[in-house]
From Swiss-Prot:
Residues 62-198 form the HD domain. GO terms for biological process: dGTP catabolic process. This is Deoxyguanosinetriphosphate triphosphohydrolase-like protein. It comes from Roseobacter denitrificans (strain ATCC 33942 / OCh 114) (Erythrobacter sp. (strain OCh 114)). Belongs to the dGTPase family. Type 2 subfamily.
Length: 387
């Protein structure tokens, strides 16, 4: 049974286009299912976060990351008696707007889009689920519930100041109450994202031999995790020791979130989800001590992983891919795929063209972006380029 402050599918604010309710699935379950079946979700399989895909199949992709986030989010939501289906829907959709090549690709596309309103991956996720997915007869997008859209827009907190154009375009006609916090379910999805990437960046960095377990054992939280494993399992081999320490690290983060949220909810005594939205700060977050420890860990990862020479070289390569594809399609929109050329025929400004080109490039997988760059810019194939 969910708590009174949980989001209730029976009281959901509805969809942009009214639909008949399902006999067997709640409105939030339908949102989750539509996200899973979306083309943009499938493409996450070939989009990476730090390592570009052709550097190795082992490293996490946006898809595996999203699945891990959803698993963590459901665990936390269950412990707090929240709606797990809404939590999972937001968790699965939170990365839909990401470009190829992780944050490097986003930085490059954002630079290209600066004269045209910029690019923001969270706003792009809204654009995808409200406009760019075009499979249904009655509407563009996925026609998700207000609660899921709110969660995508505000899972990192209230949106204030300059609102990204892609989000503003939707919010101007369908108010998502951007100045308030999102539901507890959306907040859980956001913190689950933090838990998942802190955990798997450490794992992937070790796998890539960018740092050692001895170095990790000197970091906060992780020092206790490795010490406990060594005490319980002296002589454990390297791989099992690494796994046991990292799973404990994972558990520490999840337990910290749950325990702090329980205490915060006990103090606030929210009666409805409206009370969650009106709170003076996020309900779901890390404790101050754990947050400070994570800052130390993120600083370590920034220096040893994100600035690693091999990663820096790849970043330069993929930045060039985006920086050369964008002006190419701006100059030659006739080389966009047929369905995109139809959109171009209906526009009347350079800004509208840039946004179509941005939509197209941001939806590319790492592999396809490399192929298109080789074909269109160099007149070769990736195989020929690599020789």
């Amino acid at each position: 049974m969910t708590a009174p402050y949980a989001s209730d599918p029976q009281r959901a604010r509805g969809r942009r286009v009214k639909e008949e309710e399902s006999t067997f699935r709640s409105s939030f379950q339908r949102d989750r299912d539509r996200i899973i079946h979306a083309s943009a979700f499938r493409r996450l399989k070939h989009k990476t976060q730090v390592f570009i895909e052709h550097e190795g199949d082992y490293y996490r992709t946006r898809l595996t990351h999203s699945i891990e986030v959803a698993q963590v989010a459901r665990t936390i939501a269950g412990a707090l008696n929240l709606n797990q289906e809404l939590t999972e829907a937001v968790a699965l959709a939170h990365d839909l707007g990401h470009t190829p090549f992780g944050h490097t690709g986003e930085d490059a596309l954002s630079d290209m889009m600066a004269p045209y309103g910029g690019f923001d991956h969270n706003a792009q996720a809204i654009r995808i689920v409200t406009h760019l997915e075009r499979h249904y007869a009655d509407f563009d997008g996925l026609n998700l519930t207000w609660e899921t859209l709110e969660g995508l827009a505000k899972h990192n907190g209230p949106v204030t100041g300059d609102i990204p154009w892609a989000l503003k375009a939707y919010n101007d006609t369908h108010d998502l109450e951007l100045g308030t916090f999102a539901s507890a379910e959306a907040q859980v999805a956001a913190i689950a994202d933090d838990v998942a990437y802190n955990h798997h960046d450490l794992h992937d960095g070790l796998r890539a031999e960018l740092f050692s377990t001895d170095e990790l054992a000197e970091l906060p939280i992780l020092n206790m995790c490795f010490a406990e494993v060594d005490r319980l399992y002296p002589g454990l081999n390297y791989y099992r020791r690494r796994h046991e320490a990292l799973r404990r690290f994972f558990g520490v983060l999840v337990e910290d979130v749950i325990q702090l949220a329980q205490a915060r909810l006990m103090t606030l005594q929210p009666k409805t989800v409206t009370d969650i939205r009106a709170a003076d700060r996020a309900i779901i977050r890390f404790s101050d001590d754990v947050f400070d420890d994570l800052k130390v860990i993120r600083s370590f990862l920034f220096d040893r992983m994100y600035r690693a020479p091999s990663v820096v070289v790849m970043r330069a390569q993929v930045t060039r891919v985006v920086e050369e594809l964008f002006p190419h399609f701006m100059a030659h929109p006739d080389q966009l795929p047929k369905q995109w050329r139809k959109d171009v025929e209906a526009i009347s400004s350079e800004t509208e063209l840039a946004r179509i080109v941005s939509d197209y490039i941001s939806g590319m997988t790492d592999r396809f972006a490399l192929q298109e760059h080789a074909r269109l810019i160099h007149g070769t194939t990736p195989t020929e380029t690599e020789r």
